From Swiss-Prot:
GO terms for molecular function: orotidine-5'-phosphate decarboxylase activity. Homodimer. It comes from the Bacteria. GO terms for biological process: 'de novo' pyrimidine nucleobase biosynthetic process; 'de novo' UMP biosynthetic process. GO terms for cellular component: cytosol. This is Orotidine 5'-phosphate decarboxylase. It comes from Rhizobium meliloti (strain 1021) (Ensifer meliloti). The lineage of its organism: Bacteria, Pseudomonadati, Pseudomonadota, Alphaproteobacteria, Hyphomicrobiales. The active site is at residue 65. Its EC number is 4.1.1.23. Catalyzes the decarboxylation of orotidine 5'-monophosphate (OMP) to uridine 5'-monophosphate (UMP). Pathway: Pyrimidine metabolism; UMP biosynthesis via de novo pathway; UMP from orotate: step 2/2. It catalyses: orotidine 5'-phosphate + H(+) = UMP + CO2. Keywords: Decarboxylase, Lyase, Pyrimidine biosynthesis. The keyword Lyase applies.
């Protein structure tokens, strides 16, 4: 796994239009190599943009959080492989993960199991009908993802150290909810700074609003990369 901060920082293009996303990518230039595209942008022309971004040499994390019957998940993954993106999320349900792994076999697509959304706290998990607290549910799903042959896990930085012990050193551990010191949490409930997340065992950090909504996105990305480089060099 690369030790470069630029290979580990994923900028979340949580924007309403492709035009705005293109502007951010242009502004960040060669400073940022990896971008995340989720529902908001995907359903506004972002899937074609994802193909173009991947074709241009950038890495793309397609955050679709797939979950459906086995065959539907498999067919979806087969077509996503053709897009040339680097990462894809699906909810960490055993049958869905096994189908996705088989569909992606032989490709370079890294499949990520989503454990528990970083916007959820213990009450949210209870309200959703689970008997586990968020931490226990994350660990259970991490083990299931490892057993299914997934390429990595998505979890909050709070669980990163415990998850890393379960999945070992080879799987990716992607952490959203990253906020530089002093930044607003927004709708995230389980957050951590870039340096602390890396020290906890995260391999990739997803940063959205602190960069794309910053007065100077390029300066914001450079500050976060510097913090990451400092943490990685220790």
């Amino acid at each position: 796994m690369s030790t470069s901060a630029r290979d580990r920082l994923i900028v979340g293009l949580d924007l309403p239009t492709v035009t705005e996303a293109e502007k951010i990518v242009s502004t960040l230039g060669e400073e940022v190599l990896f971008y995340k595209i989720g529902y908001q942008l995907a359903f506004a022309g972002g899937l074609d943009f994802a193909r173009d971004l991947a074709a241009s040499g950038k890495q793309v994390f397609l955050d679709m959080k797939l979950l459906d019957i086995d065959n539907t998940v498999a067919k979806g993954v087969e077509n996503i492989v053709k897009m040339g993106v680097s990462m894809l999320t699906l909810h960490a349900y055993p049958k869905a993960m096994k189908s996705a792994v088989e569909a992606a076999r032989g490709s370079n697509l890294c499949l990520l199991g989503v454990t528990v959304l970083t916007s959820m706290d213990e009450q949210d998990v209870i309200d959703a009908g689970y008997e586990y607290d968020p931490h226990s549910l994350v660990l259970r799903r991490a083990e299931q993802a490892r057993a299914a042959g997934m390429g990595g896990i998505v979890c909050s930085a709070e669980e990163a150290a415990a998850v890393r012990k379960i999945i070992g050193g080879d799987m990716a551990l992607v952490t959203p909810g990253i906020r530089p010191a002093g930044a607003e949490k927004g709708d995230q409930k389980r957050v951590m700074t870039p340096a602390d997340a890396l020290r906890a065992g995260s391999s990739h950090l997803v940063v959205g609003r602190p960069i794309v909504a910053a007065p100077d996105p390029l300066a914001a990305s450079r500050a976060i990369l510097a913090e990451m480089e400092s943490a990685l060099s220790r």
